[in-house]
Design a protein with these regions (language model features):
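Cys/His-clustered metal-coordination modules, chiefly Zn-binding fingers
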Residues: 51-127
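N-terminal alpha-helical interaction blocks
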Residues: 1-55
Length: 127
């Protein structure tokens, strides 16, 4: 058995973090999980081309899934910080960097790290 490469470790971690946030938001249906898998496949190629980008994969997968959900179903994840006014989605920051987190630009606050939305929203916490 071959050892797990840093690339595979990063991809598995990104998958797990984004799935944890989808579960916390109760939107981890089969078709949505397929969006995660599609992103992981695309990002595998991306990191193979630019190995230094391996630490950015979790944030990029979160953004990919967020964009795909917006096109198909609507905004995700909805901001838990701003209960009044128009519902709006959280954004991933940094857009290209390590240690991604969800932020509400309207309130100007960090809500949760990618993978930890359950703690911030009262949903299922990631382990």
């Amino acid at each position: 058995m071959d050892p797990v490469t840093p690339l595979e470790q990063a991809l598995h971690a990104a998958r797990a973090l984004v799935l944890a946030d989808l579960v916390a938001g109760q939107v981890a249906e089969a078709d949505v999980v397929s969006l995660v898998e599609d992103s992981v496949v695309q990002r595998r190629w991306w990191v193979e081309q630019w190995p230094d980008g391996v630490t950015y994969v979790a944030g990029l997968v979160a953004q990919d899934v967020q964009d795909a959900l917006l096109e198909r179903y609507g905004r995700w994840p909805l901001c838990p910080v701003c209960p009044t006014g128009d519902p709006h989605a959280l954004d991933v920051e940094p857009e290209l960097g390590p240690d991604p987190h969800w932020v509400c630009h309207k309130a100007g606050v960090k809500v949760a790290s990618v993978g930890s939305l359950g703690r911030a929203t009262g949903g299922t916490a990631s382990s």
